[in-house]
Amino acid sequence: MKTVTGFASATVGNVACGFDVLGFAITEPGDEVVLALHDERRSDCPVSITSIVGDGGALPLDPKKNTSSFVVLKFLEYIRTTKGISFDGHIDLVLKKNLPLSSGMGSSAASAAAALIAANELFGSPCTKMELVHFAIEGERVACGSAHADNAAPAMLGNFILIRSYNPLDLITIKPPKNLFGTLVHPHTELKTSFARSVLPKSIPLSTATQQWGNVGALIAGLLMEDYDLIGRALVDVVAEPKRAPLIPGFNEVKQAALDAGALGCSIAGSGPSVFAFSSSRQTAEAVGSAMQSAFLHSRAALQSDMWVSPICSQGARIISTTS
């Protein structure tokens, strides 16, 4: 029996001004998926979820409804029809959830990317990571009803990912500045993506759109030029953050605490409730994280939180172990 364990890390979608078109991966934490290959088919469905650890029983065990197993099923269909690789055996899947659910940290994308990189290894790596990204994006449709790439693409590919187009899919990889560190703080509360999207306006004034476009362009330029001051000036979201900030207890105080501690900028991670900040050194990033946690704790909701500091992940989804 061959087993493969895949890992994919947390991601931050939107990155302030890049609503639905920009995301990045951090090095930790992340989800793990263990796939075990068996020679004999045990049921009509070739994939079974044997266990999920760390979700508190919240995620479905139905392989067609869980994002990690769903993407493996799509992968198997793809390699059969396009690579000529047939499979008559069975795959057992174990999902180890190290990312909180409904957190704004790309939890479902990490599960999908980890499962896909493991499945690809299990069958001799017939697909490129760019091919696998398509399945990871479809996994997001199962998880939240929308096939978006701002978490799925960086979870698979690492780095910053700019989504120029969905049809056709056009992803642009942007390498991070070498001294850019991310701080990610997750308050102990949940915020459903569907609700966070429901508060957004259906249309915005042209002047607001112009301001947002300017910030997106400036952020990309700042990353490419390693201009940390420009990165900080560009981390301004005039579209989603003003509507979502009231949904996160203490957000304004947390953001101000991050800036006061030396962060280049700070905003909501994805749809929240997690909050991220950028700094130009690890020491500053850690001080920023402590200040953000303290602000959450001293907010009216008195929220406990978890905090991670890491450089931007350049590797993306990866294999962490194999056995034969």
Curated annotation (Swiss-Prot):
Chief site of localization: cytoplasm
Protein's pathway: Amino-acid biosynthesis; L-threonine biosynthesis; L-threonine from L-aspartate: step 4/5
Family matches, as Pfam families: GHMP_kinases_C (PF08544), GHMP_kinases_N (PF00288)
Keyword terms: Amino-acid biosynthesis, ATP-binding, Cytoplasm, Kinase, Nucleotide-binding, Threonine biosynthesis, Transferase
InterPro entries assigned: GHMP_kinase_C_dom, GHMP_kinase_C_sf, GHMP_kinase_N_dom, GHMP_knse_ATP-bd_CS, Homoserine_kinase, Ribosomal_Su5_D2-typ_SF, Ribsml_uS5_D2-typ_fold_subgr
Reactions the enzyme catalyzes: L-homoserine + ATP = O-phospho-L-homoserine + ADP + H(+)
Gene Ontology terms: biological process: threonine biosynthetic process
GO CC terms, sorted: cytoplasm
PANTHER family xrefs: HOMOSERINE KINASE, HOMOSERINE/4-DIPHOSPHOCYTIDYL-2-C-METHYL-D-ERYTHRITOL KINASE
Function, in words: Catalyzes the ATP-dependent phosphorylation of L-homoserine to L-homoserine phosphate.
Protein name per Swiss-Prot or TrEMBL: Homoserine kinase
